[in-house]
């Protein structure tokens, strides 16, 4: 469970992620959004899976994860997470030519967000800071910003450099 924040723009942050993250991060994002919409946080209702069943949030798994807590700190953070999730499923479609199972739940979450807050999702640009869920040497490094910390964290994984098979042009220069 993480949000790889490589850029303040959630779309740009999604586009540079490796194939593996483009496949798995939409589900992790949807699970976080489901938890935010549950009674553990906002109590805005259930996020439904593609098959119409709700994501199970009764046990509140990951409710204390730093990324979930960050997303719950403000509606702007929540908007950023939802828009990032929508950007991830769009990137999945671009790379794989298929609709990700989390596309519908994330776009429905966007509608719920608007209904409950009266804000449009573009309010994500009001995010003031992001959390760092990464090894301590990067998490506590005040000499670099959060975007650089996440880029460094991703680049440190040996498998990442060769994980842009679907579209090598998506591989950023910091990998």
Identify the residue ranges that each predicted region occupies.
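An N-terminal structural lobe/cap that precedes and organizes the functional/catalytic core
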Residues: 1-100
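Aromatic-residue-lined binding/catalytic grooves and analogous aromatic/hydrophobic interfacial grooves
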Residues: 112-175
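Primarily interfacial, aromatic-capped hydrophobic alpha-helices that serve as membrane anchors
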Residues: 100, 107-113
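Phosphate/pyrophosphate-binding catalytic cores of soluble transferases and nucleic-acid-acting enzymes
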Residues: 84, 107, 121-122
